């Protein structure tokens, strides 16, 4: 991909665990650079043509204020006196999606050196992946799934990007996949003791999770979401004081932002837009996740040639 996009390429030494964080960092930085270049190309495309810029706006939901402004421009036509100003405003609002990274926390095997001696704990698979992400240039989120790994969560405290800067921004946010409210509280409190804040709880039912079942108490998604809706305020109330205490112990400034709330999202088993709207309106979730056929993407998985 470096060759394809004309980027300089330097081979990273080391096999297996050696060099893995550096390779992960280099890969993520490359993806970010490709996205930035493609975004710039998209912005440079003309309006009123059948191109990727039109496709970008067409894919936005009808409720989007950006799509409404775009539709106004198209309806006014080429000769619109405000065309240049509106086009500039629209181009400024075109943004790329977040390049998020997922770690299945239980996939954390111990690695060995060439003499078959076990490497120290910071060289386990999940920690190497975390280090690679933490040292990348990305401003995005890391998603932890498949359970809780306390040593991995504790390892995050080595990287400043997971903490607030002086204006209250967090460069690398934390998303936790959880199966119930109790799990959200337990994991959220553990992270809070390290000064780490959960940006989003991604709720997934063990009975209806779109492709893989896992052990649970057998509660249907509606029951899980009802509890989150009723107890949502507890998430901020219980975590924030613990986080602030950690910052004080480090002598760091803790800058808050207006209207800060932990996001609640849900994924799995959503079949149509009506179901999405019901989940958002009835249970107050901030977003929904739909299945993607990632196993058919050559860059994501090894697949047989047709």
Task: Please provide the spans of the model-predicted regions.
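Extended, well-ordered protein cores
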Residues: 122-176, 187-194, 204-206, 211
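General structural signal for secondary-structure boundaries
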Residues: 1-5, 149, 156-161, 293, ...
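Short, composition-biased local secondary-structure segments
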Residues: 96-103, 152-163, 233-250
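Short, mixed-charge, low-aromatic patches
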Residues: 82-87, 141-144, 191-197, 232-235
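Gly-rich Lys/Arg/Thr-decorated short loops/hinges at beta-loop-alpha junctions or inter-strand turns
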Residues: 104-115, 136-138, 168-169, 213-228
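Glycine-rich phosphate/ribose-binding loops and adjacent secondary-structure elements
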Residues: 176-186, 192-306
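Short, basic, glycine/proline-bearing loop/turn elements
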Residues: 112-116, 170-175, 261-263
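Long, compositionally biased, glycine/small-hydrophobic-enriched stretches that function as flexible linkers
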Residues: 1-153
